Design a protein with these regions (language model features):
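Short, acidic/polar
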Residues: 23-36, 89-92, 179-189, 274-284
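N-terminal small/glycine-rich loop or linker at the start of catalytic domains
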Residues: 1-21, 113-119, 156-175, 242-269
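N-terminal beta1-alpha1-beta2 module of alpha/beta enzyme domains
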Residues: 1-68, 173-175, 296
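Alpha-helix-loop-beta-strand connector modules within alpha/beta enzyme cores
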Residues: 56-76, 134-141, 309-319
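Flexible, glycine-rich active-site loops centered on histidine and acidic residues
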Residues: 2-22, 82-152, 205-212
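Hydrophobic faces of well-ordered beta-strands that scaffold small-molecule active sites
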Residues: 8-12, 44-46, 74-76, 104-108, ...
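Conserved, mostly hydrophobic/aromatic
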Residues: 36, 40, 48, 65, ...
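Active-site mouth loops of central-metabolism enzymes
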Residues: 12-27, 79-86, 171-182, 236-237, ...
């Protein structure tokens, strides 16, 4: 994988380990991250939610993994900045970049409009109605704190007067920020304040359609779409037994999101099938221009899926 044109990431099951009975097995997350690095994966990722979909906290989990890995990038897929204070968050992410020696990628989103997420924002003291403008101000503030010596900012939600963040990231231009932008308004926002496009495209055709729209918006606004890194978040279950793969996918999606599988499958990138079919599925996205694929496995056998994917699927699609 390190020799190919495409980068591959593994999303750690930080929600599943919390959903399981008993005390969450954090050690298994470390083991899986080390295994992924050993298999040649280029990055490991953690999701984010405080209340709506409980899981291990992303940044502290990645900090622990940073101490046990040497090469893999460490990313969030995806993080919800609007739930945090921008100065504290900028400091925490810069600290993670220092711990990992410059390996952090921040995949971010504005949060889905569901009752559980709205309740989560309310409990965290954030007005859900203003989450987009809060998000925009936080991204702008963090970028400036990471790269400027003294920052003054007077926005609708946050005001800073001559603030200096003494803890700067190792990455001199700041932390790369990828955005899950699938519609026109988020895509326009991404062109202004993002570094990468990180959709959950349901097919290679949808990925191509989305990117074509971004290029058109960039041309219209006079911005450079070529600077954006093109990534994908996708969920796989690789199994020669198609029926078993579909059963595990349905159980995973419905348990994870507390929503019907059919509802989520209409908009999310999900695949079930054997090795050859998985190769064809991923190759389609590579041909569509995907530069990084972040893979989530919808299986209770995470180690088995990780091995099967790395040994039999990925070498064939990225040669």
């Amino acid at each position: 994988m390190a020799n190919g044109k495409t980068s591959f990431g593994y999303l750690l099951p930080t929600r599943e380990v919390v959903m399981a009975p008993g005390v969450p097995d954090f050690g298994s997350m470390i083991d899986l991250a080390e295994t992924a690095e050993g298999y040649g994966f280029d990055s490991v990722w953690c999701g984010d939610s405080v209340l709506a979909r409980p899981r291990l906290e992303a940044l502290s989990t990645l900090a622990a993994i940073a101490g046990r890995t040497k090469r893999v990038k460490l990313g969030t897929a995806v993080f919800l900045p609007a739930l945090r204070n921008p100065v504290i968050l900028a400091n925490e992410v810069a600290n993670l970049d220092i711990i990992s020696q410059g390996r952090v990628i921040l995949g971010v989103g504005i949060a889905s409009k569901t009752p559980a997420v709205q309740k989560e924002f309310e409990a965290c003291g954030v007005n859900f109605r203003y989450r987009v403008s809060i998000f925009e101000e936080i991204i702008t503030i963090m970028r400036r704190l990471w790269t400027e010596n003294e920052v003054s900012f007077y926005g609708r939600h946050f005001q800073l007067d001559g603030v200096t963040l003494g803890l700067k990231p190792v990455q001199k231009d700041g932390i790369p920020i990828w955005m899950a932008a699938s519609a026109e308004k988020p895509q326009r926002r991404m062109l202004q304040i993002g570094d990468g496009w990180f959709p959950n495209a349901k097919s290679p055709e949808a990925f191509t359609e989305g990117w074509n729209q971004i290029e058109a918006l960039a041309k219209e606004s006079g911005t450079d779409s070529g600077r954006l890194h093109k990534a994908l978040y996708t969920t796989l279950n690789i199994n020669e037994d198609k029926a078993q793969a579909e059963k595990e996918m349905r159980e995973f999606i419905e348990g994870y999101y507390n929503m019907p599988f059919e509802t989520m499958a209409r908009t999310q990138s999900v695949f079930t099938g054997n090795v050859a079919e998985a190769q064809a599925w991923l190759k389609g996205f590579i041909d569509a221009g995907t530069e990084t694929m972040v893979i989530r496995f919808s299986s209770p056998d995470q180690a088995g899926q990780l091995e099967l994917c790395s040994q039999e699927v990925l070498p064939a699609v990225d040669s």
